[in-house]
């Protein structure tokens, strides 16, 4: 389960936002690390449990909530690298959502832009969200 109230809010924000990504959203195929879902996401990716996972034949979404102090460190980079490798095995639209505080929004946005440029990632759409209404599609 989610470790803090802030983390829960970030996962709730991602879940609501994720519903807008697929053309024909199917609620029953989304799992999230929220009390209302009853358990953590069943999908394990290289030892990591994403906070949100959605897959239908046309779209896959992996979501990760990050607290302000858990952004640019080795653990987060390893998680993100694992999610990128995993999502590339799907033959459909690929999306990764990262949600954090309004304070960390610019830092995460810049981290994702640098990663996409450095690693030439063109087949995955990233969505950076803050805990309010701001989002950026990269």
Language model feature labels by segment:
Residues 31, 66-67, 98-102:
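Structural motif
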Residues 84-118:
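Nucleic-acid nuclease catalytic cores
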Residues 112-138:
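Charged, structured surface patches that assemble and position nucleic-acid processing machinery
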Residues 2-3, 24-58:
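Active-site metal-binding core of divalent-cation-utilizing nuclease and nuclease-like domains
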Residues 9-12, 74-83, 107-113:
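Well-ordered, non-membrane alpha-helical segments in soluble/globular domains
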Residues 68-92:
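Mg2+/Mn2+-dependent nuclease catalytic core
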Residues 1-15:
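Nuclease catalytic cores
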Residues 52-72, 83:
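Conserved catalytic cores of phosphodiester-cleaving nucleases, focusing on short active-site segments
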């Amino acid at each position: 389960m989610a470790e803090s109230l802030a983390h829960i809010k970030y996962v709730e924000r991602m879940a609501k936002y994720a519903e807008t990504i697929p053309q024909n959203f199917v609620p029953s195929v989304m799992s999230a690390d929220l009390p209302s879902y009853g358990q953590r996401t069943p999908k394990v990716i290289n030892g990591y449990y994403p906070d949100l996972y959605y897959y239908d034949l046309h779209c896959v979404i992996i979501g990760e909530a990050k607290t302000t102090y858990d952004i640019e460190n080795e653990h987060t980079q390893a998680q993100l690298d694992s999610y990128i490798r995993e999502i590339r095995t799907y033959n459909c639209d690929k999306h990764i959502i990262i949600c954090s505080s309004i304070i960390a929004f610019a830092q995460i946005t810049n981290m994702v832009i640098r990663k996409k440029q450095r690693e030439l990632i063109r087949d995955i759409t990233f969505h950076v969200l803050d805990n309010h209404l701001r989002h950026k599609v990269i």
